[in-house]
Design a protein with these regions (language model features):
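NAD(P)+-binding Rossmann beta1-loop-alpha1 motif at the extreme N-terminus of oxidoreductases
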Residues: 1-43
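Short, well-ordered alpha-helix to beta-strand connector turns
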Residues: 23, 76-77, 113
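A structured beta-alpha segment of the ubiquitous adenosine-cofactor-binding alpha/beta core
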Residues: 51-78, 88-89, 107
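Short, well-ordered coil/turn residues at beta-beta hairpins
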Residues: 76, 82-84, 119
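Rossmann-like NAD(P)(H) cofactor-binding subdomain of soluble oxidoreductases
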Residues: 88-150
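Rossmann-like flavin
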Residues: 157-158
Length: 158
């Protein structure tokens, strides 16, 4: 299966790498060019036992790639995982601007059916907001799934 993971923080990098390790073709997308270049070289910016081995193996087997281009990252993807930051706003609520910004952009660029899976830690009702943001521009069918991740760092791969 062809999969895109948008965001290469802890959740995104572990998710993308483990999906590649199970035989999927995964493109991880991040706006941080320096981080993407390091990941392409197999330099892992987080601590997670065995993750570096999985990243190196899957890069060599061409199942795991990294890009700064959302368009490039999602063009062949059947599934698009959103693993984006949701920092607390001034009032303590989750700031959804990264998630909704990417959703809006996805609506402009998807050209065939996609399943968008939100792995970010978000409040109830966010999937509907993501769906609305995509649907403002989308001319094709898509579905949105909420699948928040609560990983225990250092034990996520096991």
């Amino acid at each position: 299966m062809n999969i895109a993971v948008v965001g290469t923080g802890y959740v995104g990098l572990v998710t993308g790498t483990c999906l590649a390790e199970t035989g999927n073709n995964v493109v991880c997308v991040d706006v941080d060019e320096e981080k993407v270049n390091k990941l392409r070289r197999g330099e892992v910016p987080i601590y997670e036992p065995h993750l570096d081995v999985f990243i190196e193996r899957n890069i060599k087997q061409n199942r795991l790639t990294f890009t700064t281009s959302l368009n490039e990252g999602i063009k062949d993807a059947e599934l698009i995982f959103l693993a984006l930051p949701t920092p607390p706003g001034e009032d303590g609520s989750a700031d959804l601007s990264y998630v909704l910004g990417v959703a809006d952009h996805l609506g402009k660029i998807i050209d065939n059916y996609k399943v968008v899976i939100d792995k970010s830690t978000v409040p109830v009702g966010t999937a509907e907001k993501v769906k609305l943001a995509i649907s403002k521009h989308a001319t094709v069918n898509f579905d949105v799934v909420s699948n928040p991740e609560f990983l225990r760092e250092g034990f996520a791969v096991n």
